[in-house]
Curated annotation (Swiss-Prot):
GO terms for cellular component: cytoplasm. It catalyses: Mo-molybdopterin + GTP + H(+) = Mo-molybdopterin guanine dinucleotide + diphosphate. Monomer. It comes from Burkholderia vietnamiensis (strain G4 / LMG 22486). This is Molybdenum cofactor guanylyltransferase. Its EC number is 2.7.7.77. Transfers a GMP moiety from GTP to Mo-molybdopterin (Mo-MPT) cofactor (Moco or molybdenum cofactor) to form Mo-molybdopterin guanine dinucleotide (Mo-MGD) cofactor. It is an enzyme of class 2 (transferase).
Amino acid sequence: MPASVTPSITGLLLAGGRATRMDGADKGLQLLDGTPLALHVLRRLAGQVDEMVISANRNADRYAELGAPFGARVVPDETLDFAGPLAGLLAGMRAARAPLVVCAPCDTPSLPTDLVARLHAAFDAHRADIAMAVTVDAQHARSPQPTFALLRTSLADDLAAALAAGERKVRAWYARHKTVEVEFRDERAFYNANSWQELAALARR
């Protein structure tokens, strides 16, 4: 294992959303510079972790093909109603072989190559349950990035109970646990493609 890889962490690519602002298209499979968005993310995240898991509720064969070079496994949500990122997070936590999981959405092709190291450093320093990325712009405005986070997989049962009780908001569930915020100054690294317009904007950068 390379020295740059943080030990005992599973990487989780979140690709199980409904993508309503893309007319239901599978975001992770949309092309940026001729390459699926999900593959951009896999290439940047896989080198920072011990193993990769992909949360996907459709096109599992295609995601398995994209993930094969990284040894990634594809897992669906435990529910069939597209319950959002918390459901994908739960699926990944259940599938993880490591005690920690770090998640990232499938439509953020420029995510930081030091994402895991920085989240893990704060996680350890604060003895936290969750470390969440927060971007800070030139005007010092802070924007939480809850789908970029490092979590203990031992929280899976608590998350399952929260989902069963109807919780769908990621930050609301994080607030139940000891969460540390980790500042990132390059907000461009977290740009995503929630719509066709945002995908076109990414292509112009």
